Amino acid sequence: VPEVVDWYGKDPYNTQTFTTGLCYAICDGVAWFKTAVKDFTYPVLMLHGEKDGLVSVQDTYDFFAAASSTDRQMKIYGGLYHEIFNEYCRDEVISNTLRWMRRRL
């Protein structure tokens, strides 16, 4: 979506690099996540872009399979990348998300 690309490029907090601190935080988070997933019983909606180059789709499948939640739903969006809420079919993604949330309110 062109306006998102424009906004992203102008965001003063956007960076094209990963800091060492961010890398450590991600590694720590992944380690915690792997131990905590078995106790995850909250409602969960897993959304993922099929062509995501940052996070493996397999990670979403693995979390979904390991989570203890009985109220869970997964949607892999074909052709989308990492930022599914900023892609060409973002209206569909947002609509699906809101529908899921409203059913639980």
Q: What is each of the regions a protein language model found here?
A:
Residues 1-42:
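Alpha/beta-hydrolase
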Residues 15-17, 23, 51-55, 83:
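Acidic catalytic loop of the alpha/beta-hydrolase fold
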Residues 20, 56-60, 86-91:
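Conserved strand-to-helix beginnings and helix N-cap segments that scaffold or border functional pockets
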Residues 40, 46-48, 52:
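Short beta-strand/loop motif that positions the catalytic acidic residue
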Residues 42, 56-65:
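Short alpha-helix in the alpha/beta-hydrolase fold that links the catalytic acid
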Residues 67-70:
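Short helix-capping segments at alpha-helix termini
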Residues 73-105:
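Catalytic active-site module of serine/aspartate enzymes centered on a nucleophile-bearing elbow/loop
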